[in-house]
UniProtKB/Swiss-Prot annotation:
Coiled-coil segments on the chain, per record: none
SUPFAM superfamilies the record matches: Cysteine proteinases, Ribonuclease H-like, WD40 repeat-like
Enzyme nomenclature, EC number: 3.1.13.4
Gene Ontology cellular-component terms listed: P-body; PAN complex
Organism: Aspergillus niger (strain ATCC MYA-4892 / CBS 513.88 / FGSC A1513)
PROSITE patterns in alphabetical order: USP_3
Top-level EC class: hydrolase
GO biological process entries: mRNA processing; nuclear-transcribed mRNA poly(A) tail shortening
Swiss-Prot/TrEMBL WD repeat ranges: 96-139, 270-309
Protein name per the record: PAN2-PAN3 deadenylation complex catalytic subunit pan2
Length: 1150
């Protein structure tokens, strides 16, 4: 090893497939013909390790054990097969044999066209490389793990011995006990053999030997070993220097030593955490290291690194010629592009009389038959269910082209246009929609699976507000929208919401002082409050799912939607259930570390005893669990109906206690022993969450038994053991008032719906909404929640599992005493500290006009506040352009809240903002839309922003507090703002000037910019000279507040309709836009009246000096304005500044 040897390159090992996670390379080797390094049947070219070829030679479940090279190609070995490819990746042959069960190693024999393969099995095979066939099968008594060819064929066994085999008949010539436990690596060249391995020290676990053993193959005798204190794990002999070897440890220490002179050593340290193997190039100038972090390191001298002395030139793919440059602008006619030159008839001109339909798709196997399939000589067979007539053939081609049964309803805008049609046509349309609604509600038998179909939101040019959600939901319970990342959890969130104890804890926690940005329990409280306030309107869990997506632990567990390609939805939602419950328990303790209220409600308190079966030593540790997985016994389905061991209550008891025997570490024996694990239960929770863990098709037959899942179970704890009862047994014990008996009600369950025909698997929930009702109900009411499709179902339908497409996943039971326990005292215990103090991430100063609320200004029910928000684009809309040129919005643009401004709506400081927060955004921002939002790059970056930056959680909580304090929000276009903020505000707490100034006979909504000019003759939201300016949310909120005040004056005067007529008449002339500033504006007073506006500054909005002067001359107490109900006086064209009592002076009604 020269002095300049160092790491030349490091590359990650490519993943085994496109969507798989990276894994380690189990074998690496240098090619002796080309400048290639091979690993996982992938080759890398040259010192830069440029990827050359990659093939899948063996099944994904079989790791590559060894790679050797021949002039004709590359030979790889897996546990059950041998494969040969050319260096360009073409397969030459593949050999598998029934007695190839655990192949470990291979080597060339005395004949260069033959190899011998062996392993931990009783047979060895010799293979002809040229023909790709097995020549001979040899019986052996040894299990071989490594083979190296030199003077003899050196083979290491799994017991730590090394056998020297004859190259002619493979008989054992000499055997050495090289290591105590196993041989980890060895190499043989010329007359020397060097081995590395493991031994057991003092009855402990095997450790790496600190010596590398050396043997002379000429005399078949051992030589002095090589000392290596770091632990000799890997070894390679130098191809040129016959007595020089490379020895490496598992921690990355490299030692180059002369076997004849062990004192002459050269040390290096590789930057690896754990080494898995090394290989030396045939030239001796390059060393490859394979580590446990899925990387390959190349060491060598930068000046003269070559893999071989004389290498063949590697062949690379031809560079595809670049296509000619064409003018493909929208203005270019398609005829200018032209067609390629051809001299014969094109295949596309195939005559119609030669088109035939052949090869229809095979009929799909009935899913109900899968549990009954039995293997046969060719395929599988099952009893005929006799669902069709004899010789009846299924038209699979028609089924393949069939459309889904559930078709989206018409857009609301389309329905509004159709109202102008003839009454007869309208009646037909209404009847068709009523029939479709009847199908969804399950009142027809045409398609009973209709309500279980996938539901998707369709978008028109008016956005999501134009979608008819009421078509899917006629109940008072709100559904959750899709098209949000990780929205597959909607069904589980609905289940949590209808569990009273979880709902109460979440809302009380949300009302506390918690402002942790990633608190999942707070987000659940906000979501549950939103669902209750919505009363049947559609909602979305955007903020909660964004918080869920931010957890690195959830990403590592593969719980996100993008990780579900190779994972069933049922397994995923059960893992999410465990994560959610564990995370909300953690979040609860962040605010109340000394309280065990949540554990009392959710945790099964138990202790787990672990007893060694050898020494009988027993240890006890806590065994609390938030989720219990059902553990099914070995089932004889014929006795399932009669055997009480297969009842749900008995399976539940065995699942909670969960006795098992496994191998585990015994501290007394200091080794792994067979241990017995037993759980003793001390307290059951008030909410019993269960994962169905239904992976065995045989166990699914238990669920198919009618009434197998009980609505009620009773549990008694006696001496650390539990007793479970159901059905008549439970009724008898309830009547006898059994001591300690706790009865649980089934609140609901989450199910996976997997209908193969044109449907993708999705999740729904069945919930008994009567348990969470505020008024006691005599009858249980079950509802289906399929995202935003909500409908009532029968109890029998909810608890029926005899169809293979309905798979139970998560169950929730709650103590019967918790029925109707809806606690709303959190509204009286709101922690409003956040409203009365400044909070900033970056120490930025808010606008000077902002004044934080004082304690005397604490909002009360009915307090008006003006609101305006600004947003930035996080994702652009996804638009599908069809062949006819029409466009369909597949997914709308995604916005992020960037600024929130809230102003006082009454009092001496009326119009003064008390909230003006900029929100930091961690996602990628694709467009700041500065001309509309006023947000510029850097405004939301805590490192450079000069504004008051807060997390989304803080800004949202301020709005949520104002909502639950009873404030009335005044603004323009509030519905869009509330939707993007993801908050639900009742209509009784909303004043939207967009609807106040709405003419019933005019199908048009007026912009805030036009209303400001039409009512006050003021210009706002003007187009800036450059893109660095934009809307001001404080200005917009203040204008909406003034418009509301003015509208109330119009109402008192009884002239609303006349004012609206004049506003719309004037707007139709101007295109509903303010006229240019250089024109002569007129003041709206009453129909037919106009007054010229005078302003010395030349602007219709007052200058800064005018505002300051008006504010300075304002009296200490606001003037008491009076209203004239009949006579109107013109405006004087001026107004006082915000925060003064005369802020709305200049009204024609003052």
């Amino acid at each position: 090893m020269e002095a300049d040897w160092d790491e030349l390159s490091r590359i990650p090992v490519p993943a085994p497939s496109v969507h798989a996670l990276p894994t380690i390379a189990t074998a690496i080797a240098f090619d002796d013909v080309m400048e290639l390094l091979w690993g996982r049947i992938t080759s890398f070219f040259g010192p830069e390790l440029q990827r050359y070829t990659s093939v899948r030679a063996h099944p994904a479940t079989e790791p590559v054990r060894q790679i050797i090279f021949h002039d004709r190609g590359v030979i790889s070995l897996s546990p059950k097969s041998v494969h040969m490819i050319t260096r360009r990746g073409l397969t030459q042959w593949h050999i598998a044999h029934e007695e190839m069960t655990d192949l470990r190693c291979m080597s060339f024999t005395a004949q260069t066209n033959r190899i011998i393969v062996a392993g931990c099995q009783k047979s060895m095979f010799t293979i002809d490389i040229d023909k790709g066939i097995i020549i001979d099968k040899l019986h052996t008594e040894y299990n071989y793990t490594i083979m190296k060819k030199s003077r003899y064929l050196c083979a290491a066994t799994d017991t730590g011995s090394v056998n020297a085999l004859s190259l002619n008949d493979f008989s054992v010539v000499k055997s050495w006990k090289a290591h105590g436990t196993a041989v980890n690596d060895m190499d043989a060249r010329n007359d020397l053999l060097v081995t590395c391995g493991f031994s057991v020290r003092h009855l402990g676990s095997p450790i790496v030997d600190p010596l590398a053993n050396v043997y002379d193959l000429k005399t078949l005798s051992p030589l002095p070993p090589i000392p290596f204190h770091a632990g000799a794990a890997y070894v390679r002999m130098h191809p040129k220097l016959h007595t020089t070897s490379f020895v490496a440890s598992q921690t990355g220490q490299l030692q180059v030593v002369d076997l004849m002179n062990p004192n002459a050593i050269n040390l290096r340290q590789a930057n690896v955490s754990f080494m898995l193997g090394i290989d030396l190039s045939p030239s001796g100038e390059a060393l490859a290291i394979n580590d446990a972090e899925c990387a390959i390191h190349l060491w060598g001298s930068p000046a003269k690194v070559h893999f071989n002395e004389m290498s063949k030139e590697a062949e690379f793919g031809d560079v595809a010629p670049r296509p000619p440059t064409l003018d493909w602008s929208p203005e270019t006619p398609l005829s200018m592009i032209g067609m390629p030159y051809y001299h014969e008839r094109l295949f596309s001109a195939w005559p119609s009389h030669l088109v035939f339909e052949v090869g229809s798709p095979p009929p799909q196997v009935d899913q109900a038959l899968i549990p009954y399939l039995r293997p046969a000589e060719l395929g599988h067979h099952a009893p005929n269910p006799k669902k069709t007539r004899r010789y009846q053939v299924e038209n699979t081609r028609a089924l393949a082209s069939a459309e889904p049964a559930l078709i989206a309803p018409k857009f609301l805008s389309e329905k509004a246009r159709e109202q102008n049609k003839a009454k007869s046509e309208g009646a037909i349309s209404d009847a068709a929609e009523a029939l479709a609604g009847a199908k969804i509600n399950g009142e027809t038998d045409d398609d009973p699976l209709l309500k279980y179909s996938n539901v998707e939101i369709k978008y028109s040019r008016f956005g999501v507000d134009d979608f008819d959600f009421r078509f899917y939901n006629q109940t008072t319970f709100s559904g959750l929208e899709t098209h949000i990342a990780n929205s597959f959890t909607n069904a589980l969130l609905q289940l949590f919401k209808f569990i009273p104890y979880i709902r109460n804890v979440a809302l009380h926690h949300a009302a506390s002082s918690c402002i942790f940005e990633t608190c999942l329990l707070c987000e659940m409280g906000y979501l549950f409050d939103m669902l209750e306030k919505a009363s049947g309107q559609n909602c979305q869990a955007t903020n909660l799912l964004k918080t869920f997506s931010s957890y690195r632990e959830a990403s590592n567990l593969g719980l996100f939607e993008e990780n579900l390609t190779n994972k069933s939805l049922s397994a995923a939602i059960q893992a999410v259930n465990r994560f959610f419950l564990g995370q909300i328990s953690h979040d609860f303790r962040m605010i109340s570390p000394s309280s065990d209220d949540l554990d009392h409600r959710l945790a099964t308190v138990a202790s787990e005893s672990i007893r060694c079966m050898f020494c009988q030593n027993e240890i006890v540790r806590p065994g609390n669990s938030l989720v219990n997985e059902l553990n099914y016994p070995a089932i004889d389905i014929k006795q399932a109906r009669r055997n009480p061991a297969f009842r749900f209550s008995n399976i539940l008891r065995a699942s909670i206690e969960r006795e098992a025997q496994n191998r585990g570490w015994c501290n007394y024996c200091r080794r792994y022993q067979q241990v017995a694990i037993r759980k003793s239960v001390h307290r059951m929770p008030q909410v019993l969450m269960l994962n169905a863990a239904l992976t065995n098709p045989i166990c699914r037959r238990l669920w198919a038994i009618p009434g197998w899942l009980p609505e009620e179970v009773g549990i008694v704890i006696e001496g650390g053991q539990i007793l479970c009862f159901e059905g008549e047994d439970l009724k008898l014990r309830v009547q006898a008032k059994m001591p300690g008996l706790v009865v649980y009600d089934l609140v609901g369950l989450v199910c996976e719906i997997d209908i193969p025909e044109h449907q993708k698997a999705h999740l729904v929930s069945f919930i008994n909404v009567s348990i969470s009702s505020r008024e006691p109900e005599t009858k249980n009411k079950w509802h289906l929640f399929n995202d935003f499709l909500v409908t009532e179902v029968d109890k029998e339908e909810a608890l029926r599992f005899n169809q293979p497409w309905k798979i139970p996943c998560v169950l929730a039971y709650q103590v019967q005493d918790g029925r109707h326990a809806m606690d709303d005292t959190w509204k009286d215990a709101l922690d409003t500290t956040l409203l009365f103090r400044d909070w900033s991430l970056n120490g930025g100063r808010p606008v000077e006009s902002r004044v934080t609320l004082s304690e005397e200004e604490k909002p009360t029910p009915g307090t008006p506040v003006a609101l305006d928000t600004e947003f930035v684009d996080l994702e652009k809309a996804e638009i599908d352009v069809k062949a006819d040129g029409s466009q369909e919005i597949v997914r709308p643009s995604k916005s992020g809240l960037a600024r929130v401004s809230v102003l006082r709506g009454s009092g001496i400081r009326e119009g003064v903002p008390f909230i003006d927060d900029y929100i930091t955004i961690k996602e990628n921002i694709v467009d700041y839309v500065t001309q509309y939002s006023g947000i510029k790059p850097g405004d939301l970056d805590p490192r450079v922003s000069q504004h008051n930056l807060v997390p989304l959680k803080v800004a949202y909580k301020k709005l949520w507090l104002l909502l639950n304090l009873g404030c009335v929000f005044v603004g323009h276009g509030l519905a869009s703002d509330f939707r993007k903020v993801n908050i639900q505000v009742p209509k009784s707490q909303t004043v939207d000037t967009q609807y106040l100034f709405f003419h019933p006979g005019k199908n048009r909504r007026l912009s805030l910019r036009y209303l400001a000019w039409a009512v006050f003759k003021e210009y706002i939201q003007e187009e800036p000279a450059d893109d660095s300016q934009g809307h001001d949310s404080i200005e917009d909120a203040r204008m909406a507040l003034r418009l509301w005040k003015k509208f109330k004056e119009y109402e008192d005067a009884g002239i609303v309709s006349q004012i609206l007529e004049e506003i719309f008449r004037e707007g139709s002339k101007l295109g509903f836009r303010p006229p240019p500033r250089n024109g002569v504006p007129t003041v709206l007073s009453r129909p037919g009246t106009a007054v010229t506006m005078q302003n010395n500054s030349g602007r219709n909005t007052p200058s800064t000096s005018d505002v300051a002067g008006a504010a300075a001359s304002a009296p200490a107490t606001p003037r008491q304005a009076f209203r004239r109900s009949i006579a109107l006086t013109p405006s004087n064209g001026s107004f006082a500044g915000p925060g003064t009592g005369d802020f709305f002076s200049g009204s024609p009604l003052k």
